[in-house]
Amino acid sequence: MTAPMDVDNLMSRLLNVGMSGGRLTTSVNEQELQTCCAVAKSVFASQASLLEVEPPIIVCGDIHGQYSDLLRIFDKNGFPPDVNFLFLGDYVDRGRQNIETICLMLCFKIKYPENFFMLRGNHECPAINRVYGFYEECNRRYKSTRLWSIFQDTFNWMPLCGLIGSRILCMHGGLSPHLQTLDQLRQLPRPQDPPNPSIGIDLLWADPDQWVKGWQANTRGVSYVFGQDVVADVCSRLDIDLVARAHQVVQDGYEFFASKKMVTIFSAPHYCGQFDNSAATMKVDENMVCTFVMYKPTPKSMRRG
């Protein structure tokens, strides 16, 4: 039986940790995190595998545990439910505050299920976040591998794709050679850790490549890279105008491909503390016009740790 959840109280403590630099483990206990996962899982399960949402909405790319940068996005655009958001995955790994990041987002999902949408990224898969930081953080901060496992159960229910105003198809990674119709996306099974190969794996892992025509094996060792011709074909076949995806660091936070039929959005500035990239978010207004907000890396003197 899941313990009752006071989502407002948990959100205020998570936000206070972000604003004050307080310690998460003294503010939020493991049972509360487990309850948050369980409640969020039921919300994901109640919604479709292809999230069909209407504008206006803000689309955000990778966050990777950069909690203060997530808060910058809300400060700049507003908080739900005043503003609608669609995040394209990769909430955990690499950054320093993975647990704060994913839990605040799950709280927003629970409290505002029709205003706040989260797709799954490849880092919301156990084989990846076991290695790239999230497992270690759960273990170090809460001394709990069970907590990590409970997060995986929630991640397995996350949708893999979204459709804004019937015209903008969104996913974390990219397209699939097996994708022929939107109904295939509506029928993607959950819960699951997508098998390799599958449409699900491609949605999480595939990348555009300006030097490729058609499909080629991806140097990541998973899925494919695809050319501009593929994007044009898919937009025509699915009757869409734009594909929005994340998954790759781009210098200005956003980058177009295939005559502006695809855009990559990356929302973690100064990624990993090693890149000097800006971040960006994409606003889709009521008329389906897309504009971008950029977030410069914060000066070194302002960065925590």
From Swiss-Prot:
Phenotypic consequence of gene deletion: No obvious phenotype. Simultaneous RNAi-mediated knockdown of gsp-3 and gsp-4 results in male sterility due to chromosome segregation defects during sperm meiosis. gsp-3 and gsp-4 double mutant hermaphrodites have egg laying defects and no viable progeny. gsp-3, gsp-4 and him-8 triple mutants have incomplete separation of sister chromatids during the second meiotic segregation. Mislocalization of MSP in activated sperm. In addition, have partial reduction in mpk-1 phosphorylation and air-2 association with bivalent chromosomes in the most proximal oocyte in response to MSP.
GO terms for cellular component: chromatin; cytoplasm; nucleus; pseudopodium
InterPro entries, sorted: Calcineurin-like_PHP_ApaH, Metallo-depent_PP-like, PP1_catalytic_subunit, Ser/Thr-sp_prot-phosphatase, STPPase_N
Residues involved in Mn(2+) 2 binding: D90, N122, H172, H247
Catalytic activity, reaction form: O-phospho-L-seryl-[protein] + H2O = L-seryl-[protein] + phosphate; O-phospho-L-threonyl-[protein] + H2O = L-threonyl-[protein] + phosphate
Pfam families: Metallophos, STPPase_N
Active site (record annotation): H123
Keyword Protein biosynthesis tagged: no
Protein name (record): Serine/threonine-protein phosphatase PP1-gamma
EC numbers for this chain: 3.1.3.16
Keywords: Cell projection, Chromosome, Cytoplasm, Differentiation, Hydrolase, Manganese, Metal-binding, Protein phosphatase, Spermatogenesis
The keyword Manganese is assigned to this record: yes
Residues given in the record as Mn(2+) 1 binding sites: D62, H64, D90
Cell compartments where the protein resides: Chromosome; Cell projection, Pseudopodium; Cytoplasm
Tissue: Expressed in male germline including spermatocytes, spermatids and spermatozoa.
GO molecular-function terms, A-Z: metal ion binding; protein serine/threonine phosphatase activity
Function field: Probable phosphatase which plays a redundant role with gsp-4 in spermatogenesis by regulating sister chromatid segregation during meiosis. In addition, involved in sperm motility by controlling the dynamic disassembly of major sperm proteins (MSP) in the spermatozoan pseudopodium.
Family: Belongs to the PPP phosphatase family.
GO biological process, one term: reproductive process
Species: Caenorhabditis elegans
